[in-house]
Amino acid sequence: GRYLLISSSREGSLPANLQGVWNNNNNPPWSSDYHINVNLQMNYWPAYVTNMAETTIPLVEYVDGLREPGRVTAAEYAGIVTDENNPENGWMAHTQSTPFGWTCPGWDFYWGWSAAASAWLVQNIWEHYEFTEDLKYLKSDIYPIMRESSMFYKQWLIHDENSGRMVSSPTYSPEHGPVTIGNTYEQSLIEQLFVDTIIAANALETDSELRDEISELIPKLSPHHIGEWGQIKEWYEEDNADFNDKDVEKGHRHISHLLGLYPGKAITDETPELLEAAKVTLNDRGDEATGWAKAHKLNLWARIGDGNRSHKL
C-alpha cells in the first residue's frame, strides 16, 4: 500500500485515481476517474498513519482546484451563488470527478448525486493538520477550503418538519437504496465537517460568527439513529414502501451509514449504544465484499476494538 500511494501521488502531480498510474487501457473501468463517494478518500486513509503526509499534497491541491467549478455547480444545482459580494460562498462536488475538475452529478443523476461528497473530501485534508500540526499550512491551504465548504452546507440545509432536524435533501446513500432526505451518510459527513471547521477556526482564532452559526446547527443534524433490530439506520425512515427487508440489499458493498465510526469520530467508546449498533450493522452486512469494501470493514472493526475480526478480514 505504501508503494502504491508513493508511486501514484507526489507533489506536483494529480492525486491517485481508481487505477493509480498503472492503467493500460483506453477504456478502463469507470474511466479510471475519481470516485469521491469512498474511493478517492480511501486511497489516502493510510497516508498519515504510515507517516506519508507528503503524498497528500496532490489531494489538497486537487480539492482546492474543485472549488471554482464547484461554485458553478452550487449555483446551478443548489441556488447558492458566489458573486463579488460573496466571493467564497460555497462549493459542491458529487460522486464522480476528473482531472479537469468535474463537479456535477455525473453519468446518471440517481447514483451520481452526492451532495455531501465534498464534505467527505474535506475530512481527508483536515487530517493533514491533525497529524502535522502545521498551523501555517492550515491557514494558507486547508482552512480556506474547509471554511467555504461549511459556508455551503449551512445554506444548503433545510428544516424537516416531520423530524425537527436540519437536513440535506435530496440524499442518496452511495449506490444503495432510495432517494430520501437527511440520510445517515450525508448528515454524518456534514456534522463532522462542522465539528472540524470549528476546531480549525479556533486554532486560527478566526471566523467567530461562522463558528457560532454552525455550532447551532450541529445538534439539529442528528445523523445517527438505532433501528428496530438494533442497527444503525441507513435512512431516517425505513418503514415505508420504498424499503425491502432490512438494508434493501443485504450484504451491500457500501457501508456509508457507518462513516461516523470510521473514518469519522462520532461513534466511539463514549457512545456505547451507537457502538453496539454499529456491531449489529457490520454483522448483518457480513464479511464478504469487494476488496475495497473489506478494507473499510476491517477499519470499522478496528475502531470498534475487535482486532481479531480485522485480522480475519
Where are these regions (language model features)?
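Structured loops at beta-to-helix junctions and adjacent beta-edge loops in soluble globular domains
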Residues: 8, 171, 264-266
